[in-house]
Amino acid sequence: MTKAQICIMISIVIYLVAMVMIGVVYSKKTKNVGDFYLGGRKLGPLVTAMSAEASDMSSYLLMGLPGLALVSGLAEVGWTVIGLAIGTYLNWLIVAKKLRKYSARINAITIPDYFSKRYKDNSRLIMAVAALMIIIFFVPYTASGFAACGKLFGTLFGIDYHIAMVVSAIVIVGYTSLGGFNAASMTDFIQSIIMTAALIIVLVFGVNKAGGMEQVIANANNLAGYLDVFKGYDAATNSAGSFGAIKVVSTLAWGLGYFGMPHILLRFMAIEDPNKVKISRRVAEIWVVISMAVAVLIGVVGMAMVKEGALPVFDDSETIIIQIATLLSKVGVVPALLAGIILAGILASTMSTADSQLLAASSAASENIIGGLFRIKLNETSQMIVARVTLIAISVIGVIIAWDSNSSVFGIVSFAWAGFGAVFGPVMLLSLFWKRSNRYGALAGMVVGGIMVFVWKYAIAKLGGIFDIYELLPAFICGLLVNVIVSLITPKPDDEIIEVFDELKHNK
């Protein structure tokens, strides 16, 4: 191992040990399943904001977005970022406070639990379907995080991808299963700081090695359509592509996904004071906009570095930040330690999402299927054991899915994002803003939204032309329409449900 690799390893080991220690500390504070899954609703506004956005950004912030910008310019990635920024703001503005109050009023600690109690579904069918959808889409989403860790260590140290991926999974599972929601939230808060430091260091060093910002822009301008948000760059033909109105709307639709992301919505449910949501919203939006803009710029800088010969040509564009960090590590001991911080940032972006996803998937299986659907009564100790065993079991499945070293982080995240947005987005909005929405509409909307994601991606989109759009948009619309139509043609909600809705509506 070289001196640079040793310095990088030291930084990463310190980071990983710190994450596990946080899990150990919070394991002593986790007394029941309410603490394990929702932290007792005691999350402060700053931790709520930063942990929500760190768990949101995942590995696509430091791998997916820069990689996409590098190979295709600003068109697709630019509109994606705009859609995500708008979606983030609207989610905090119209969903966060209402969901916090509603979930506390009906004593719901998971998203399936919220839907079941909101619609007074005594059959538990809504809870079961919601839990099943969470597991279906979260397991591959978590697998993408494990895959990112495997790529990181494999590229850096020549470690076998599978060994690196399994070790990373063990660390994530370790601190999450020990400390639950509070551990995940605190580590996510710390990880958001590390991710920020990583982005800044990479950008400054990259611009310097590329010959300055003027040279970066000049290189980008030499590539046809690279900086044009209505064209984009086609690397295969070395010419400008085409990014018309349909593709723009389709890509902006990424923002719709936020209304249905269980691991983000759980943070809204956990904030200590609903009146502090405004503080969280401002912090979250500022961090998201700046971090995504820097991530995209790093991709553009990476292309300039390749053109200037500062970086060799490499196959996997999603490893651009790893490539820049490796170059930095060769400058000296201190730069190598900084490179370690950068790479810990990639780990942070992955782990901050994976831990939250594991909690959501594990709660869906243990709380909502075992305890909810099958009505198996367990004491607090048994519930905690089941929660942790379920979390480990789901992680094992994630490792199996991530076993293919050629899997694309951006591709997996894109599909899972569409799934959650289409399944839970429409029903979440209607549950908060339309009192005529009932359990029949909610159930039908979730099922149709989930099915349409698969149908559109694997069948309709292949027709091309106007049908070649991001599956989230048509699936979201279908789920919304079905929910509304079915609600209108079936009996209206019980008086008790409407009373609670009106009570919260007037309780500003």
Model regions and ranges:
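Membrane-embedded helix-loop-helix hairpins and adjacent transmembrane boundary segments
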Residues: M1-K508
